[in-house]
Amino acid sequence: WKPFVGAMKAEVTDNNGQKYSVETILGANELYDVAKFKITAKTNAALFAPSVVANSAAWIVMPSQAGAPIKANIDKVEKFMTKYNYCVLSTTASEKYNGAPVLNDKGQIVGIYNSNGTLQSATDAKYANDFVLTGLSQNDPTLLQSGIRIALPQQPDEAIIALMLSATKIESLRMATINDFLQKFPTLNNGYVTLATKLLANGEVAEADKTLQQAIAKTTAKDEAHYNYGRLIFQGVTTAAIADKAKAQGWTLDKAMNEANEAYKLNPAPVYKHLQAQIVYTKGNYQQAYTDFEALTNTPIKNPELYLEMAQCQEKLNASNEAVLAMLNQCVELCDTPYMETSSPYFLARAQQFNKMGKYR
């Protein structure tokens, strides 16, 4: 593992001198100094030794260009984590052989070589082979010591978590993770909407539109795909910095509503009705928007945002200050405690209303 620490890229050289780039990290352990990674090639895996016994011979093998194999003796075999072998060796192999495979007389892998100057050992390669990534592996302190991309888990639910956590990565790693997700899980909406959101933030409206239409064509949850399309159209139309590009792409509030309606027709989820209500408000039909927001307070998505939106409708409808304040009080009452940063817009809106009413205390 040590060679990967601080590295932005790495190469593996096989016995024929062929070099392969390391594509992703699949796991690592600092204590045993082992790592699991994927290279940009398909190769035939060596066989693991079915058993290892003390007082047997082994060979520490490097690519032939780097030198001949060095013989070692397995002095002692210890178990760790109940099923893996840790072999103490006697050998003349130096630290430059660290990470090399240790093979038995049959060419089967006994372990991964490590020398710290005073102790020579081989850690069971099956231990590294059994590493399994989870979504939270994106924030694993050990794996973050390397600049090489952490791979996505195999399970879709875990991969979705990994995709979300990759938002903090540098641009190249973030984009590689998104593209990897799209390749591995082409029928899930998460990859498409993540990419489209990123494209939209960069002002690439046409590419975002193309990505969202691909989602509608390829994903299994069509309602979610239509909702994401409508939501990002709405975002594009109402964001001043990209409004002109959105208009040029044919994005309008009516188009956003059509997508929201299609999503709701496929699956009458409250979140889709919420998008419809937001579009109605933006189009200036404040009474209908208020009615729609109010209806949503009787659904599972009852939250502070709905009451803030109802307060905004009340203001547009010239309701009394007290009526607006009542809605904003509901906002604050629904905020989770202890209060988090996400609650600040609701406290700010209420404070502004108090100021408007002359209630400065």
Task: Indicate residue ranges for each PLM-predicted region.
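Catalytic-histidine neighborhood of serine endopeptidases
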Residues: W1-E30, Y127
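Flexible, gly/ser-rich surface segments that form the specificity/activation loops bordering the active-site cleft
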Residues: N44-C87, T92-N98, Y113-T123
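C-terminal cap/linker of serine protease catalytic domains
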Residues: I112-N179
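Short coil turns that delineate tetratricopeptide repeat
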Residues: P186-T187, T220-A221, K265-P268, I301-K302, ...
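Start-of-helix register in tetratricopeptide repeats
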Residues: N190, E224-N228, A269-Y272, E305, ...
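Residue-level recognition of tetratricopeptide repeat
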Residues: T197, R231, T238, Q278, ...
